[in-house]
Amino acid sequence: VSNMRLPMMMILLVLLALCAPLQAQTRPELDAAGNGLLVLSYHDVRDDVAAKGDPDAYAVSTQNFAAHLDWLSAHGYHPISLSQLVKASRGEAVLPSRPVLLTFDDGLRSVYSKVYPLLRAYNYPALVAVITDYVDMAPDRTIDYGYRPFGRDDFLTWDQLREMKDSGLIELASHTDNQHHGVQSNPQGNSTPAVITRAFDPATGRYETAAAYERRLRDDLSRSASLIEKNLGVRPQAIVWPYAAYNELSNAIAEQLGMPVSFDLEGRSTPVTRDLHGLARLLVTGNPNVTGLAFELRRNITLDGTRALQIDMDAVYDADPAQLARNLDTLIDRVKKIGPTHVYLQAFADPDGNNTADALYFPNRHLPMRADLFNRVAWQLKTRAGVKVYAWLPVLGYELPDPVQKQALGIASPEQDGMYRMDFTKPAARQIILDIYEDLAINSYFEGLLFHDDAYVRDTELTGLAQEGEDGNRTQALIDFTLALRDRAQRWRPKLGTVRNLYAQPVLEPQSAAWFAQRLDLFNAAYDHTALMAMPWMEGSSRPERWLDRLVAAVREHDPELKHTLFELQTVDWRTRTAIPGERLRAQVRRLQAQGVRHLAWYPDDFIADKPSTADARAAMSARNFPYPER
């Protein structure tokens, strides 16, 4: 949505027509907290780690680590080995109740001097992930390890690894040979994890080719596995990806080299199946004592609320690089001050405001690139503002530069509202859109997708599709296409979250759902969240607060606990082109929260003009104390 997009949205709402009421479905819970394997990720263990504020955020004190082992034992957790896990995945063994795998990253010397004696005392197995290039490094070599340079004496030796391996308690995983660092990922100079980045060469102005990227990964992983086998007599079965950054290609290469198990840092527990790639780990940070560890393990993350700002990249972009840089700094500063959980960041350019993509903000095969900007802005938001970034893209609305191709692949609609959409039932159109999502993932960092509000099909269009009916055939066809887009992007960005925009009218008047092929119950069953446009002024309501109350009541019919529905407020009355007062927005947020709404967003967020004001935005959209206070 934008100021320029108002006429289109109003026209779409006017065109809503009648159809039969539809029956709700229930979303299955896929991965309940605590129902699976718990994997804990440790790094350095030292005697002198500060209780709070240690320079190494990943270090744990020896005393606290010993207390963790005590607590796990006393509360029914059963440490397992990697070999037990692999056998269980093949159906050759049964894991004990509450299985936990202890992992130690980077191959630091403290694993031998502090951790190993405690593991022997408890008879607990563990997995140690070594960066083979750091083992037995040259005496004069140092590694930038964050808070100070680390040298030879900070990392394990092959002799120490051999002793621990021979004990039967310690198994070894690769942490790559030398990919535990960043490489330049865009023309602006940002550095992102080497394993997932096709490096940008400023000398040539080109990105690493697909073949060169694959060769770099294969050579590195082969060297790491071979060094472990040569020095320890056993080939590693697992790869622990640096920074939890990996993709389908890296996992495939690892498996071809004998490492069918891989770990990341996404999620809290993993059901044990035959596929052991991308196992979730809980990263232990901040030197937690037993209370802190128990807090994290018992916390129900499904109760965490979302606070999201939907951001126009068109407002960040400027043809003048200096002004663009100032715009980006303003955005980062504002988001950091507000403290939301997410930013939904526009990845397409829509300078004419007609709700479709004229160009894209990333390298791609099919549309012009307005600027190679999305990756930079997304990475800056993550690293400087500390938010999760979801890429906001159209589903169907791509205006191809070739007018003949554009016409041939568009939906032939009897409705003349000016909204161009590609016909996703045509193989050529599907392939182009799939390519766009894949190109985004190849070239950019993001953690999820926001599917734009252009994904609709009227009952007068695409007559070859089955009519909507009670089963929601057309709605499901569009959902299936969006999930195919997600799957294509997930080749390069695993475990993507999904959010999809939904107009309010199909929720308030279910008989109108068939006009757009959009249904809340089916959306909530398919996506992590549905971004419901809770925009009373856009809907022409004269009593906005009462309208919001009615919307919440209607949503509860499909989502009784409001787990999956995100209410997206409007900050501008596009009819009058005036901003909604900040106090009124804050009151609306309080009103929705009082009715049990957990997930909130708003649009637009005018970071250039500071509207809504940063103070109002912080009060309404900060997640710093939601739902749990800082410890």
What are these regions (language model features)?
Residues 40-48, 54, 98-100, 120-245, ...:
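Metal-dependent polysaccharide deacetylase catalytic core of the NodB/CE4 family, i.e.
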Residues 61-80, 326-352, 443-448, 523-529, ...:
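Catalytic domains of carbohydrate-active enzymes, especially glycoside hydrolases
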Residues 95-97, 110-120, 331-332, 349-394, ...:
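Aromatic-lined substrate-binding rim segments of carbohydrate-active enzymes
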Residues 142-149, 303-324, 378-379, 388-439, ...:
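Active-site-adjacent "subsite" loops/lids of carbohydrate-active enzymes
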Residues 242, 388-398, 450-454, 474-516, ...:
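Aromatic-lined carbohydrate-recognition surfaces of secreted/lumenal glycan-active proteins
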Residues 245-281, 497-536, 577-578:
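Substrate-binding cleft/loops of secretory-pathway carbohydrate-active enzymes
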Residues 265, 269, 341, 527-545, ...:
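Substrate-binding cleft of secreted/luminal carbohydrate-active enzymes
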Residues 305-315, 499-507, 555-585:
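Active-site clefts of carbohydrate-active enzymes
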